[in-house]
């Protein structure tokens, strides 16, 4: 793989040309008393995460929850109505009763706190079956993304939003907005940066992919998703501890940056891979790793569907280079991490542990093999599962 590095460009332009900033701080940008008599809408975990992504510019060029024209265009052709690449509609669903009562400026709440507002411009019917078929490639209610879609309200509100503050939450050291990540990249002088998206603890195969990529670029952004995930996924706080010990012991500090990615998982496989790549461009990243079954769940998507879908766009449209890697694993005969391209041995020689198998071992108090994950990571996971009882 040959990658040509720019000698001058440090940061790619955000999608749409400008990084959206919809932060409006109470007491600074407006008088909180203005909100006293406005209607309020409580957000779900996913919608609260979407509000943050919109407000900080992570979802540039979107300035709010999408309207009907963009909604249909995204579903039908993976583009906004103006032709800009975009793969998943970012909507604000409500019930019919709520839709009939909400208009104008609506204060958005989460956890009992005012977190932002939306200026409602449109209300339109959600095409749930159509959205499920096109975005998730299935209408199976067992699919977690489809289940969430079917459970939400039947009407979508559209309009520009304001975000009152960045919810740094449990990870204040690692929670950075796109503008803040861009500032770190610029300060470090990285001409090229690769991002790695994960919702799982990093095992040796992930480490291998990251370090191969790091041979080709100046910096690595380890960008774990910490928004809402499936109930059986490893909790975000445990994963972040695992990332910290891994980076402290096995990565060059000056060439790596750990920063959390506050989006919620949709488990939309190929479509979500595009969303993850485009949003990383907004964070100032030039390259994005897509491995096997990116953002997938169960057997709904083919192993490399999330790589092949990028052919729907011209490379210059994306503004970020996709690094496509095959499945990697430890081969006991080769004595190292390999891929099908480099290993001549059949699967009986390979050490491959599924997420389910890893969780079974941890619940049983078993030690994960060193060929699968670093001992420091294994210990973090073991302690976390032991504490759960």
Curated annotation (Swiss-Prot):
Q: E.C. number, please? A: 2.7.7.4
Entry-linked Gene3D superfamilies: HUPs (3.40.50.620), Sulfate adenylyltransferase (3.10.400.10)
Q: Which segment of the chain is annotated as a signal peptide? A: none
* Reaction it catalyzes: sulfate + ATP + H(+) = adenosine 5'-phosphosulfate + diphosphate
Protein name, as recorded: Sulfate adenylyltransferase
Q: In which pathway does it act?
A: Sulfur metabolism; hydrogen sulfide biosynthesis; sulfite from sulfate: step 1/3
What is a GO molecular function of this protein?
ATP binding
Q: Tell me the keywords, alphabetical order.
A: ATP-binding, Nucleotide-binding, Nucleotidyltransferase, Transferase
HAMAP family the record matches: Sulf_adenylyltr (MF_00066)
Instruction: Please tell me which top-level EC class this enzyme sits in.
Output: transferase
Source organism, top-level taxon: Bacteria
One Gene Ontology biological process: sulfate assimilation
For this chain, the family text in UniProt reads: Belongs to the sulfate adenylyltransferase family.
**Is ATP-binding given among the entry's keywords?**
yes
Q: Does the keyword ATP-binding apply?
A: yes
């Amino acid at each position: 793989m040959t990658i040509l590095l720019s000698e001058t460009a440090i940061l790619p332009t955000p999608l749409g040309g400008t990084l959206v900033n919809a932060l409006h701080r109470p007491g600074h940008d407006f008088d909180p008393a203005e909100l006293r008599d406005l209607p309020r809408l409580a957000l779900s975990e996913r919608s609260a995460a979407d509000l943050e992504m919109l407000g900080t510019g992570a979802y540039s060029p979107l300035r709010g929850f999408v309207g009907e024209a963009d909604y249909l265009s995204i579903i039908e052709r993976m583009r906004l109505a103006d032709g800009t690449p975009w793969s998943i509609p970012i909507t604000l669903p409500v019930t019919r009763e709520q839709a009939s009562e909400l208009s104008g400026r609506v204060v958005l709440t989460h956890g009992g706190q005012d977190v932002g507002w939306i200026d409602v411009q449109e209300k339109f019917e959600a095409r749930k079956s159509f959205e499920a078929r096109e975005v998730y490639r299935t209408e199976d209610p067992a699919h977690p993304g489809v289940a969430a879609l079917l459970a939400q309200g039947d009407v979508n509100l559209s309009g520009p939003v304001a975000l009152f503050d960045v919810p740094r939450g449990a990870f204040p050291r690692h929670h950075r907005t796109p503008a803040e990540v861009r500032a770190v990249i610029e300060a470090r002088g990285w001409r090229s940066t690769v991002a790695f998206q994960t919702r799982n603890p990093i095992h040796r195969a992930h480490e291998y992919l990251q370090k191969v990529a790091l041979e080709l670029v100046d910096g690595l952004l380890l960008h774990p998703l910490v928004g809402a995930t499936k109930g059986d996924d490893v909790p975000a706080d445990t994963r972040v501890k695992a990332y910290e010990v891994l980076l402290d012991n096995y990565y060059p500090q000056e060439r790596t940056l750990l920063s959390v990615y506050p989006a919620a998982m949709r488990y939309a496989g190929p479509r979500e891979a595009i969303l993850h790549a485009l949003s990383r461009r907004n964070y100032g990243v030039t390259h994005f790793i897509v491995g096997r079954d990116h953002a997938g769940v169960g057997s709904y998507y083919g192993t490399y569907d999330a790589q092949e879908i990028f052919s729907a766009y011209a490379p210059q449209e994306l503004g970020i280079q996709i690094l496509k890697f095959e499945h990697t694993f430890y081969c006991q005969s080769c004595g190292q991490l390999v891929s099908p391209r480099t290993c001549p041995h059949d699967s009986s020689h390979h050490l491959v542990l599924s997420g389910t198998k890893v969780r079974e071992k941890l619940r049983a108090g078993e030690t994960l093999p060193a060929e699968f994950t670093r001992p420091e990571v294994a210990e973090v996971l073991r302690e976390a599962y032991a504490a759960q009882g």
